Design a protein with these regions (language model features):
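Short aromatic-enriched loop/helix-cap "lid" or pocket-rim segments at secondary-structure transitions
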Residues: 33-35, 59-64, 115, 142, ...
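Contiguous beta-strand/loop segments that form the cofactor/metal-binding neighborhood of enzyme cores
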Residues: 88-161
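C-terminal helical cap and adjacent loop that interface with cofactors, partners, or active-site loops
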Residues: 170-176
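Predominantly a Rossmann-like dinucleotide-binding segment in NAD(P)-dependent oxidoreductases
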Residues: 27-102
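Glycine/Thr-rich phosphate-binding loops of Rossmann-like dinucleotide-binding domains
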Residues: 4, 59, 161
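A general structural signal for well-ordered alpha-helical segments in protein cores
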Residues: 7, 33, 88-89, 161, ...
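Short helix-capping segments at alpha-helix termini
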Residues: 15-19, 42-44, 123-125
Length: 176
């Protein structure tokens, strides 16, 4: 659902037909995400969450030709944030809760749908940044940075590899 009205409609329909309404954000239900949650403590004080999910839409070429398919119709909640950006934001909220401050920018297409965006979130003692796009590609991973190390997730939408890297000892007198 993309708004409160749709949520109420879905709840009513599930009650009417006696079926279970379930969350569809599959990546947070996987063993790899559970591993991330269980290992956050290894990072020490967490200072940053960064996530990127940019995937050039197979429908964008048609859009550039003037054909607006459903993937770029805002009335269907099919902008980049609602379609794929949510995969970067939802895990962050699950792990760290509601941010104190949000600052966002993006590119709005002629249809009114957002094609891509960047969002900065502020938490107490921590920052988060997410990038998302349906009009460009990226292969950047998701990373959670702490004072004692970091955890990298290869892809936030389908978490395959999770890697913990401990902080390297600081070198005295040479560089950072």
């Amino acid at each position: 659902a993309s708004n409160a009205w749709e949520v109420r409609e879905m709840i009513a329909a599930s009650a009417k037909y006696d079926v279970t309404l379930m969350e569809a954000m599959k990546p947070i239900l996987t063993p790899n995400f559970r591993s991330v949650r269980e290992n956050l403590g290894r990072l020490g004080t967490i200072r940053r969450y960064f996530s990127c999910y940019c995937q050039y839409s197979s429908r964008y070429d048609k859009f550039k030709e003037g054909v607006v398919l459903n993937a770029f119709r805002p009335e269907l909640s099919n902008g980049a944030m609602m379609d794929i950006g949510i995969y970067t934001v939802y895990p962050m909220v699950v792990l760290f809760g509601r941010p104190k401050k949000i600052d966002a920018s993006g590119i709005v297409l002629s249809s009114g749908a957002d094609g891509q965006g960047a969002v900065n979130f502020e938490y107490e003692g921590m920052n988060a940044t997410v990038l998302y796009s349906k009009i460009a590609n990226s292969s950047l991973p998701t990373e959670i940075q702490g004072e004692e190390g970091n955890i990298t997730l290869d892809r936030i939408n389908i978490i395959g590899e999770v890697k913990y890297t401990p902080r390297l000892a600081a070198a005295s007198g040479r560089g950072p």
